[in-house]
């Protein structure tokens, strides 16, 4: 009988030991996978910034191009001025605007009238990306986001140094319907933005997503997405908010006045 008990104890010991080893392996793998996912997300974002900046990536790795041509800077949304650190002490190199927007100490809750992009909260500090060639700044890239039909849509908009002319746009995260709202990623649709003016003569946000098609030669109009009116409305709200006084409006006003020089 004692022999049977010893056998059972040994079996249980082996099972427990294997379980512990397996749990350690799984935990280690999960941590490694999470780190890899974070690294991939950073690389993807850098790739999109390099793309919308119009930088020729041939023959060089994205991190090298990003380090050479892109300078992240922090901006105080209220004043439009550059700042060295965010409220949590982060610098442009490690600032997480999404995380800040969720923290009541580092963000503001938007009223229904203010919240044209349907994002609920806005961080007090934003990040922009200066496109540089040596000491010269050729463009500025602003990150924008707004709610579509099914998802929050995140994009980068490249703006010339006049603070008004679009040189490119790319969506890097969205979950809209493939073939409909998901066409925000279509290069043909995105190409319509190039050369458009963000503001009218009174410096008010002027980009218009036009259902049925923008008039030919329109300075501000972009064709709506066929069969995706609500996604188009989300794109419209995104531009209305982020070009306005609660978004990058004050910063872009300073860019127009030569604030990058």
Swiss-Prot record:
> What gene makes this protein?
nqrC
Q: What is this protein called?
A: Na(+)-translocating NADH-quinone reductase subunit C
Q: Which residue spans adopt a coiled-coil conformation according to this UniProt entry?
A: none
Its family remark reads: Belongs to the NqrC family.
Organism, per UniProt? Answer: Vibrio campbellii (strain ATCC BAA-1116)
State where the protein is found: Cell inner membrane
Q: Which cofactor does it need?
A: FMN
User: A GO molecular function for this record?
Assistant: FMN binding
Keywords tagged on the record: Cell inner membrane, Cell membrane, Flavoprotein, FMN, Ion transport, Membrane, NAD, Phosphoprotein, Sodium, Sodium transport, Translocase, Transmembrane, Transmembrane helix, Transport, Ubiquinone
Task: Please write the reaction equations for the catalytic activity of this protein.
Answer: a ubiquinone + n Na(+)(in) + NADH + H(+) = a ubiquinol + n Na(+)(out) + NAD(+)
Q: How does it sit in the membrane?
A: Single-pass membrane protein
Organism lineage reads as: Bacteria, Pseudomonadati, Pseudomonadota, Gammaproteobacteria, Vibrionales
TM segment ranges: 12-32
Biological process (GO), any one: sodium ion transport
């Amino acid at each position: 009988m004692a022999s049977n008990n010893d056998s059972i104890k040994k079996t249980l010991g082996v099972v427990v030991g294997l379980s512990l080893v397996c749990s350690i392996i799984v935990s280690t793998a999960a941590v490694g996978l999470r780190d890899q996912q974070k690294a991939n997300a950073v690389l993807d974002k850098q790739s999109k910034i390099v793309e919308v900046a119009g930088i020729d990536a041939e023959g060089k790795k994205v991190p090298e191009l990003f380090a050479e041509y892109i300078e992240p800077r922090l901006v105080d949304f209220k004043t439009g001025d550059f700042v060295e650190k965010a409220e949590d002490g982060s610098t442009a190199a490690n600032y997480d605007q999404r995380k800040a927007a969720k923290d009541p100490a580092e963000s503001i809750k938007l009223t229904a009238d203010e919240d044209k992009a349907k994002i609920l909260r806005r961080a007090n500090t934003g990040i922009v990306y200066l496109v540089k060639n040596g000491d010269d700044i050729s463009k500025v890239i602003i990150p924008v986001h707004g709610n579509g039909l099914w998802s929050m849509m995140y994009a980068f908009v490249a703006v010339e140094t006049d603070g008004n002319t679009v040189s490119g746009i790319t969506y890097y995260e969205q979950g809209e319907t493939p073939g409909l709202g998901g066409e925000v990623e279509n290069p043909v649709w995105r190409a319509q933005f190039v050369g458009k003016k963000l503001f009218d003569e009174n410096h008010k946000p002027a980009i218009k997503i036009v259902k049925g098609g923008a008039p030919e030669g329109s300075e501000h109009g972009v064709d709506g997405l066929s069969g995706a009116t609500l996604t188009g409305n989300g794109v419209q709200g995104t531009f209305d908010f982020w070009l306005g006084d609660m978004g990058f409006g004050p910063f872009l006003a300073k860019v127009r006045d030569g604030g990058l020089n």
